Design a protein with these regions (language model features):
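G-domain G4 guanine-recognition motif of GTPases
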Residues: 11, 144-145, 170-186, 218-231, ...
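Beta-strand-loop-alpha "switch" segments that mediate conformational coupling across diverse proteins
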Residues: 210, 215-216, 221-224, 242-270
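P-loop/Walker-type NTP enzyme "switch/lid" segment
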Residues: 40-115, 171, 182-186, 211, ...
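Short mixed-charge
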Residues: 165-218
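Conserved ATPase-coupling elements of RecA-like P-loop NTPase cores
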Residues: 95, 121, 125-132
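NTP-binding/hydrolysis catalytic cores, primarily Walker-type P-loop NTPases
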Residues: 248, 262-305
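Inter-motif core of Ras-like GTPase G domains
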Residues: 128-148
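Walker A/P-loop NTP-binding active-site region of P-loop NTPases
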Residues: 4-69, 116, 129
Length: 305
């Protein structure tokens, strides 16, 4: 049985992707799953710091630049069943990864002896990020209540749909498609718009890939929720995406603001290990139960593990 791949991303930096990725990984490991975390923030790898680790000589750059097998660059953490691959360290010489390189990485990850492989992406919709999202079993988008975070996530979703279109069309048809969308946006001056309706009604384009995208919907987690309004933000984002993108978003839950998080970051200990009885533990358990077994109502899982 091949490893399942979860990819955690966001349109904006500083919204808690690394915190969420590490917490999901820890929770899965406590549920007796074998988990590998991969730091895919090409310009600012820091997932290792969350676990109090120092930089390793072997990291993801060895895989891409020296063809080192993945099994030779991951290492165990002090948490049972949880392993880690550190990200790029030569950020002064950024690496632009191709679609083919990412596809090979996905194939190699599935062959590893893990139940789950979680990617912690850098901010924004690079081609490598979008290709990983397209290939993933679970596509997890992180937002907080800041308007800039919400806006950039809409941009990320828009870019993801366009990337999906590109991978499912010929170069000529994709060029026509981009021109049609650009003309529509300039005419309406809107930040988001209905891809599917415009392409079908005005340009004659028809696609069935929207239905295929719905088979693995984007999952949304709202981080650092401080109020009921913040908790309800996920439902608002879901509604907007359905209206303008004709895309279903699954709002899997929110993670409440907790001072224990920044305190644990300063001490370089994962919050779910340093403070195991924080309410965050139950929130991440609920999310993981929803993702690993969507037929169950994860809202009933509030036990601290």
């Amino acid at each position: 049985m091949s490893a399942k791949i979860w990819v955690v991303g966001a349109g904006k930096g500083g919204v808690g992707k690394t915190f969420v990725t590490s917490s999901l990984g820890i929770t899965l490991s406590k549920l007796n799953h074998r988990v590998l975390l991969i730091d895919f923030d090409i310009s600012g790898a820091n997932l290792h710091t969350t676990f109090g680790e120092n930089p390793k000589a072997k990291n993801l750059s060895n895989y891409f630049q020296k063809s080192t097998p993945l099994k030779d660059i991951y290492y165990g953490t002090n948490i049972p069943r949880l392993s880690l691959i550190q990200g790029f360290w030569d950020s002064w010489s950024p690496t632009d990864l191709s679609v083919d390189q990412v596809k090979k990485l996905v194939v190699d990850c599935r062959e590893l002896d893990f139940d789950y492989v979680l990617f912690d992406l850098g901010p924004g919709p690079s081609v490598a990020h979008l290709e990983l999202f397209l290939a993933a079993d679970e596509r997890i988008l992180i937002s907080n209540s800041e308007p800039t975070s919400v806006e950039k996530n809409y941009r990320f979703i828009e870019a993801f749909i366009c990337h999906s279109l590109k991978q499912n069309s010929t170069p000529d048809s994709h060029s026509k498609l981009e021109n049609a969308l650009r003309t529509y946006r300039e005419a309406h001056k809107k930040g988001v718009f209905s891809f599917r309706n415009h392409l079908s009604n005005e340009c004659g384009f028809t696609f069935d890939f929207f239905e295929r995208l719905q088979e693995k919907p984007l999952r949304l987690i709202v981080n650092e929720a401080r109020s009921r309004q913040d908790q309800d933000l996920g439902h608002s984002i879901k509604s907007v995406c359905n209206k303008y993108f004709d895309l279903c978003i699954d709002y899997v839950g929110c993670v409440e603001f907790d001072n224990a998080v920044w305190q644990s970051v300063k001490s370089r200990d994962p919050v779910l290990i340093d403070k195991p009885f924080t309410p965050l533990a139950g929130q991440f358990l609920s999310i993981c139960k929803h993702l690993t077994n969507p037929n169950l109502n994860a809202n009933y899982y509030r036990a601290v593990i």
